[in-house]
């Protein structure tokens, strides 16, 4: 199977074609929320700002906002974007030379209420422990560009064109879990990912589902689990919520 994994420590993805950069940025954007910090490493021309542009534009599209012209804040140091209640701070630290200059940027001020994207993070001495790290490389001889993702999201398998499966974030429960609908043609499944919860919480979620099925109560079947990286893939029972289903049943009964 000609597949690659997008988010393990050994991931190396060919993004030489811009549509691959766009597809990967779209998928990656579904995992980001307030408080997340993303470091983008790589030389000039490696594709960092292009990736950020698609990332921000996809977040804007998802919120039905007009698209911004996203450029590298080389001289401004930081550009800010607001998408509804999400503030995105895009930093470029290339021109920063002294620690004092870095402190004046307000880099991690109130970061928990924002999404922080940082190009040239090598200038930062005291780095936050929780962060995503993207490493961009560019081979001038072959004109090839690659990206590695260091912080594990999950080892989601994707075809090399990065466009065969579609991923759409859907409403979940009141927990920190993230739910994605993975689809290809008429086939679909649900990815349940726990970014902020412990392994125990995901095991409990799985155990409850198994118990429901055992007692002949409709619940999604488990297709694949990776408890080490905090995600499972389960059956997609449809797009309607339980409230919509019961509402339809009540209406049908009233008609009778």
Which stretches of residues belong to each language-model region?
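N-terminal pre-Walker A segment at the start of P-loop NTPase domains
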Residues: 4-27
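Conserved lysine of the Walker
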Residues: 48
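Post-Walker A helix-loop "phosphate-sensing" segment adjacent to the P-loop in P-loop NTPases
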Residues: 57-69, 83
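ATP-binding glycine-rich phosphate-binding loop
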Residues: 162-183
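ATP-binding pocket architecture of kinase catalytic cores
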Residues: 183-256
């Amino acid at each position: 199977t000609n597949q690659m994994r997008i988010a393990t420590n050994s991931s190396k993805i060919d993004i030489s074609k811009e549509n691959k950069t766009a597809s990967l940025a779209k998928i990656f954007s579904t995992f980001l929320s307030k408080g997340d910090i993303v470091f983008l490493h790589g030389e000039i021309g490696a594709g960092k700002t292009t990736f950020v542009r698609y990332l921000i534009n996809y977040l804007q599209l998802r919120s039905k906002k007009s698209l911004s012209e996203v450029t590298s804040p080389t001289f401004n140091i930081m550009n800010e974007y607001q998408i509804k209640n999400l503030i995105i701070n895009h930093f470029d630290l290339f021109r920063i030379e002294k620690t004092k200059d870095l402190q004046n940027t307000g880099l991690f001020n109130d970061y928990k209420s924002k999404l922080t994207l940082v190009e040239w993070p090598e200038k930062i001495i005291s780095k936050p422990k929780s962060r995503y790290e993207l490493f961009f490389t560019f081979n001038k001889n072959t004109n090839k560009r690659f990206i590695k993702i260091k912080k594990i999201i999950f080892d989601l398998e994707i075809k090399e064109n990065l466009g065969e499966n579609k991923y759409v974030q859907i409403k979940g429960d009141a927990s920190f879990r993230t739910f994605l609908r993975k689809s290809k043609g008429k086939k679909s499944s649900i990815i349940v990912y726990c970014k902020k919860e412990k392994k125990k919480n995901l095991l409990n979620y799985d155990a409850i589902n198994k118990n429901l099925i055992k007692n002949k109560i409709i619940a999604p079947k488990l297709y694949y689990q990776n408890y080490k990286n905090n995600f499972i893939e389960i059956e997609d029972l449809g797009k309607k919520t339980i409230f919509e289903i019961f509402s339809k049943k009540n209406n049908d009964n009233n008609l009778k």
